[in-house]
A protein has these predicted regions:
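Acidic, glycine-rich active-site loops and adjacent beta-strand->loop/helix elements
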Residues: 41-48, 72-76, 107-109
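Conserved thiamine diphosphate
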Residues: 32-35, 82-114, 166-174
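Histidine/lysine/aspartate-rich catalytic loop segments that bind and position anionic ligands
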Residues: 61-88, 92-94
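Glycine/aspartate-rich loop-and-adjacent alpha/beta segment that forms the canonical ThDP
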Residues: 99, 109-175
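A short alpha/beta connector and helix-capping loop motif
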Residues: 48-73, 128-131
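Cofactor-binding active-site loop characterized by glycine-rich and histidine/acidic residues
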Residues: 1-60
Length: 175
């Protein structure tokens, strides 16, 4: 695969990404590499048992070169994450599994940069960054709508979304 430099694999919603990341992180440690491994999970994805098995593995092997990033927007393809199969409280569970946890606003780039920097300094345990986000943020017809999970907009919706996001970007940049 590896069509994007630095991205070794894409995974689906069944929790396989963190298991692959654990293998990559352990392999790097065994080979004496200083590389870091990052994996992105959704809050619906962490309902899968494989995720928690991988968390045990990461903690047991002290994979301090592993950073798990969780998008906690409360929605999944079937609706409200808490109603489908609640993984909450995410932070408490990850800490119980031996992770260093940073809970941040996933729309705050300064907080994201700080959490990623902190992850590099943690020794002896993996890091999880739990990012509270809003699905479809700043797109009027997508925001907080589970129905947009895995659905592409049509041409008119795409144009509207891009116009709204461009307006928001201009606002943030003071234009």
């Amino acid at each position: 695969m590896n069509t994007v430099p630095g991205v070794d694999r894409s995974t689906g919603s069944l929790g396989q990404g963190i298991s692959a990341a654990c293998g990559m992180a352990l392999g790097a440690k065994v080979k004496g590499r200083q590389s870091r491994v990052y994996t992105l999970l959704g809050d619906g994805e962490i309902q899968e048992g494989q995720v928690w098995e991988a968390c045990m593995f990461a903690s047991h092997y002290q994979l301090d070169n592993l950073c798990v990033i969780i998008d906690n927007n409360g929605l999944q393809i079937d609706g409200d994450v808490a109603k489908v199969m609640s993984p909450y409280p995410i932070v408490d569970k990850l800490e119980a599994f031996g992770f260093h946890v940073e809970a941040i606003d996933g729309h705050d780039f300064t907080a994201i940069e700080a959490a990623l920097a902190k992850a590099k300094t943690v020794k002896g345990k993996p890091t999880a960054i739990v990012m509270k986000t809003v699905k479809g943020k700043d797109v009027s017809f997508m925001e907080n709508e589970a129905g947009w999970h895995g659905v592409a907009p049509n041409d008119a919706q795409y144009e509207q979304a891009m116009a709204e996001l461009t307006a928001k970007l201009n606002e943030l940049e003071g234009k």
